[in-house]
């Protein structure tokens, strides 16, 4: 469960990072991206562990709120699943069509950007 939560928060962070404050960005990057403890972050920013914890929890809630309103991550997941299905279908049914395979690969690379 914890791994899934971390993955989700990291994914939401990728989508909504520009909407967060610098402090929110810094705390989440250190906590989820660099695996810092609350104590290490608190020490770096000269604040209490509780202040860091509260900020991270509040920021997680903000990210979930953005996703509930904008659905960027959910739509990205759907597009990725569809792109995977198309890619599988083309590889299975048109393995010799170099142009089609190239176009599908290009589509997949665009989605990853």
Swiss-Prot record:
Top-rank taxon, per record: Bacteria
InterPro entries assigned to the protein according to its UniProt record, in alphabetical order: RNA_pol_sigma_r3/r4-like, UPF0122, UPF0122_fam_protein, WH-like_DNA-bd_sf
HAMAP family in the cross-refs: UPF0122
Function (record text): Might take part in the signal recognition particle (SRP) pathway. This is inferred from the conservation of its genetic proximity to ftsY/ffh. May be a regulatory protein.
Entry's family note: Belongs to the UPF0122 family.
Protein name (database record): UPF0122 protein Lreu_1156
Species, as recorded: Limosilactobacillus reuteri (strain DSM 20016)
